[in-house]
């Protein structure tokens, strides 16, 4: 297998580079064909690497960057004021084809602005969209947009639908069912942009559009791809993660109430751990920026070691599936 090379914005995220370095080294151990370059402050990164054991330095390099984009920094400031930020340098490595993907846990708005500026979008795409896999009763659903585009036109939603369909195809889904997230399934429901988007999706060649889906239908697995604007998608994603965490905590508390519940809990522990692992936000961490001329994966800023590993794994899959090239080909068929 040929090598996969990924640039890691090692300075992004809420907790600094420690967990990012640990996750990177863990991924190297698990994937012999993987090569990583950590982008950031060399002295700090070397110190963190030296504290780890069994590090294959032939597959782990450091690219220096003197500046860091903070989580509360405005995208315009990040774009114009920090030309040597770790985020920008990582994206420039991707643009210059020195790596095949970029992963960052940094400021979402800054990452989107820099990605569009440095990499540019694919022909036929006005705005990239963030997509992630959401667990459902039937498996997983690709949900987009997750916050990159708060206000969207009907044409943007059409572009998101096409990109989400291609992303689902790379995961082995044949003729993915595409739906628009709405407050009802009837044609009369929804705002004007959603209604206009429905008309466009119905006319799109080669797109398996099945109509509107409500929030509960998403979790029942009624669609493989669910499309919405970034305002709605981000709220849905964060609410889902919070709900999953709350349910797990409530069940754990119930099993600790008395001796009988503790005994029942001990019997149910293997199943509960499996369910908790399936629903854990860390397992599903990593939202792809679809529509760029390159692979960019956004990790949660609050992700720990396991969560950041998941983001790197998502980038690996997209490299192996050659997602930008496949996406470009499908966009030519459906949009151009």
UniProtKB/Swiss-Prot annotation:
Entry annotated with the keyword Transferase: yes
GO CC annotation, single: cytoplasm
Record keywords, A-Z: Cytoplasm, Lipid biosynthesis, Lipid metabolism, Phospholipid biosynthesis, Phospholipid metabolism, Transferase
Compartment(s) of residence: Cytoplasm
Biological process annotations from GO: fatty acid biosynthetic process; phospholipid biosynthetic process
Family matches, as SUPFAM superfamilies: Isocitrate/Isopropylmalate dehydrogenase-like
Pathway membership: Lipid metabolism; phospholipid metabolism
Entry-linked InterPro entries: FA_synthesis (IPR003664), Phospholipid_synth_PlsX-like (IPR012281)
Catalytic activities: a fatty acyl-[ACP] + phosphate = an acyl phosphate + holo-[ACP]
Organism domain of life: Bacteria
Cleaved signal peptide residues: none
GO molecular function, one term: phosphate:acyl-[acyl carrier protein] acyltransferase activity
EC number of this enzyme: 2.3.1.274
NCBIfam families, A to Z: plsX
Primary role: Catalyzes the reversible formation of acyl-phosphate (acyl-PO(4)) from acyl-[acyl-carrier-protein] (acyl-ACP). This enzyme utilizes acyl-ACP as fatty acyl donor, but not acyl-CoA.
Family statement drawn from the similarity comment of this UniProt entry: Belongs to the PlsX family.
Subunit note: Homodimer. Probably interacts with PlsY.
Annotated HAMAP family: PlsX
Protein name as it appears in the record: Phosphate acyltransferase
Gene from which this protein is expressed: plsX
């Amino acid at each position: 297998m040929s090598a996969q090379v990924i640039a890691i914005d090692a300075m992004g995220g809420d907790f600094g580079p420690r967990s990012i370095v640990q996750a990177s080294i863990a991924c190297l151990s698990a994937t012999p064909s993987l090569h990583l370059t950590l982008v950031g402050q060399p002295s700090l990164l070397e110190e963190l690497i030296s504290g780890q054991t069994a590090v294959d330095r032939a597959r782990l390099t450091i690219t220096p960057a003197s500046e860091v984009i903070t989580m509360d920094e405005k995208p315009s400031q990040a774009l114009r004021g920090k030309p040597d930020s770790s985020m920008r340098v990582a994206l420039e490595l991707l643009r210059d084809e020195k790596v095949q993907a970029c992963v960052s846990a940094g400021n979402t708005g800054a990452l989107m602005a820099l990605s569009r500026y440095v990499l540019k979008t694919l022909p036929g795409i006005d705005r990239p969209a963030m997509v992630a896999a959401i667990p459902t009763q039937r498996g997983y659903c690709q949900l987009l947009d997750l916050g990159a585009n708060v206000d969207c036109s009907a044409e943007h939603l059409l572009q998101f639908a096409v990109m989400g369909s291609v992303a689902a195809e790379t995961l082995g889904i044949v003729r993915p069912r595409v739906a628009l997230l709405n407050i009802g399934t009837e044609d009369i429901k929804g705002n004007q942009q959603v209604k206009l988007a429905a008309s466009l999706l119905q006319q799109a060649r080669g797109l398996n559009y099945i109509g509107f889906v409500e929030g509960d239908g998403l979790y029942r697995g009624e669609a493989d791809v669910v499309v919405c604007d970034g305002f709605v998608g981000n709220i849905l994603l964060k609410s889902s993660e919070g709900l999953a965490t709350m349910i797990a905590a409530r069940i754990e508390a119930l099993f600790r109430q008395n001796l009988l519940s503790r005994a029942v809990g001990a019997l149910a522990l293997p199943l509960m751990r499996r369910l908790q692992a399936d629903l854990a936000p860390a397992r599903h961490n990593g939202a792809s920026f679809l529509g760029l001329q390159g692979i960019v994966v956004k990790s949660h800023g609050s992700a720990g070691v396991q969560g950041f590993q998941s983001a790197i794994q998502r980038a690996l899959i997209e490299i192996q599936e050659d997602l930008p090239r496949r996406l470009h080909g499908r966009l030519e068929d459906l949009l151009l």
